[in-house]
Each structure stands twice: as structure tokens, then as C-alpha cells.
């Protein structure tokens, strides 16, 4: 039987693509803005 090779960690996921991390940079804010415009229920990983 094969092993699962991709096992993500919650801490890294939040640090890389959490809401507060996105808000720190201009491009990150653009990501949030685009997701708001599209009407996404979850704007980032750490929300919802």
C-alpha cells in the first residue's frame, strides 16, 4: 500500500495564506479584493 506523501500542516498554511498575512502586502490585498468581488464565502484559509 502506498503512503500519502502530501500531508499539510495547519500552522504553515495559515502563515502562508491566512487573512492577516494577505493583508500585509499590496498583492495580498488584491487577492482578498478579487475574492470579495467574486463573492467567495471564504476569503482566505483562516476564515470560516
From Swiss-Prot:
One GO-annotated biological process of the protein: translation
Entry keyword set: Ribonucleoprotein, Ribosomal protein
GO cellular component: ribonucleoprotein complex; ribosome
GO MF annotations in UniProt: structural constituent of ribosome
Parts of the chain that traverse the membrane: none
Family: Belongs to the bacterial ribosomal protein bL34 family.
The name this protein goes by in its record: Large ribosomal subunit protein bL34
Phylogenetic placement of the source organism: Bacteria, Bacillati, Cyanobacteriota, Cyanophyceae, Oscillatoriophycideae
Amino acid at each position: 500500500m502506498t503512503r500519502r506523501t502530501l500531508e499539510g500542516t495547519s500552522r504553515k498554511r495559515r502563515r502562508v495564506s491566512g487573512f492577516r498575512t494577505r493583508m500585509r502586502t499590496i498583492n495580498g490585498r488584491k487577492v482578498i479584493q478579487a475574492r470579495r468581488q467574486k463573492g467567495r464565502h471564504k476569503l482566505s484559509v483562516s476564515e470560516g
